[in-house]
Amino acid sequence: MPQAAPREDRAARRAEVVAALSPVLPAHALLWHSEETVPYECDGLTAYREKPLAVALPETEEQVAAVLRTCHRLGVPVVARGAGTGLSGGALPHKLGVTLSLAKFNRILSVDALSRTARVQSGVRNLAISEAAAPHGLYYAPDPSSQIACTIGGNVAENSGGVHCLKYGLTVHNVLRVRGYTVEGEAVEFGSEALDAAGLDLMGVLVGSEGMLAVITEATVKLVPKPQLARCIMASFDDMRKAGDAVAGVIAAGIIPAGLEMMDKPMTAAVEDFVHAGYDLSAEAILLCESDGTPEEVEEEIARMAEVLGRCGATAIAVSQDEAQRLRFWSGRKNAFPASGRISPDYMCMDSTIPRKRLADILLAIQEMEKKYQLRCANVFHAGDGNLHPLILFDAADPDQLHRCELFGADILETSVRMGGTVTGEHGVGVEKLNSMCVQFSPEECEQMAALKRAFDAKELLNPGKVIPTKHRCAEYGKMHVARGLLPFPDIERF
């Protein structure tokens, strides 16, 4: 485990950084006292915590550029932060760095109903975009479970999805243009509101880059018309494999639902006790399948989905009869994470993906892992695109439980890759999945990622120590395990 920086060295570095940033930020926009930085010591992955030297809260793009230029000159790491709802430790502060909060970049700059676009600052909440577009009969499609709080800047950084991403796509499919600043404080703008095929797709590179390439300050996003009607099917299954086969069956039938989600029995019990959505507590698994469009389209698709689900062994099928019932069906899925927080002191949410045909296999494997690691796990996930969200329940105050939880999570990710999947679908790598990158990618592939990182950030100051494994890490996997969010030898050369 790394030794903490001597207190006097850290204090001296903080004094230097605060003195350098004070001329470029108002006094109220620079926090450095211990009690002021506590709210920024972690993101949604609360098991790992670290206080930054200081927190910068710029209000203008000029201030963002000035903070970045100053930190670049001093060689100070910078970790950009949106709402801090991420689940992989992507916004975990650097103990000798500055956290750059975009919380004050919260203005919706324009909503254009004719072009069906919205131009927003990066600190705007995901749901606020849909609220602003609602008077025009439009909304923003990507809808992560944290949409009431998460920001568009964080969504861009993680390439977030949501329960409706199967039909409407991830963030990368719904963003037209991004604006931001490099680590040297230079403005960059990628993408266009018009068809843009010239050059390399640098916007595609920036979306999902986890704050490692640039700091996003603004985005132009697509808006889509609200459907005339949406209805949801809730299907119960007495066997996990039947439920998994039903997911594959729906897609194989040529149906692309607006949403196709799955919950296992432990998760169903947790959310039903929390929101009383009317779930079947005797079911081993529940599927939520949504159709939207014109009334005629919805009626036909609902009938087709119900037929497939019944053929695959559903023991009960309920169809929402009005908007209130549809929202009640979805309330359990949307509240899965807070419901889990009610039954466990802590949880760690994995985010691997799996081919749909292997859903039952991975869920049964996770059940065996529960016995191996002596920890409970509740499963909820985007079944339509095979994006798993197993929530491992544990107590972070118990070091042994945390260690077993980390091993459990790594086992899920490795098994997912072995079954043809990936280590993350939308939550990002952060620090949580750093080891597991070596399971999915070769040293040569990691070298290409590192080379791209250096092209944007030669000093490697933006969100360092995350996403890309350290040099030779793939060969050393198992000897350099991330524990409690800390990495031995954090300053080792990266590829």
Label every PLM stretch briefly:
Residues 186, 435-495:
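Activity-critical C-terminal alpha-helical subdomain
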Residues 26-27, 417-429, 452-454, 458-467:
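Alpha-helix capping/hinge segments and adjacent helical runs
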Residues 88-106, 134-138, 161-172, 219-225, ...:
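A glycine- and small-aliphatic-rich helix-loop capping segment at beta-alpha/alpha-beta transitions
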Residues 31-41, 221-225, 231-408, 415, ...:
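C-terminal substrate-recognition/cap domain of FAD-linked oxidoreductases
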Residues 1-69, 86-116, 145, 265-276, ...:
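N-terminal flexible segment immediately upstream of the FAD-binding catalytic core
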Residues 107-261, 462, 478-483, 489-495:
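FAD-binding subdomain of flavoenzyme oxidoreductases
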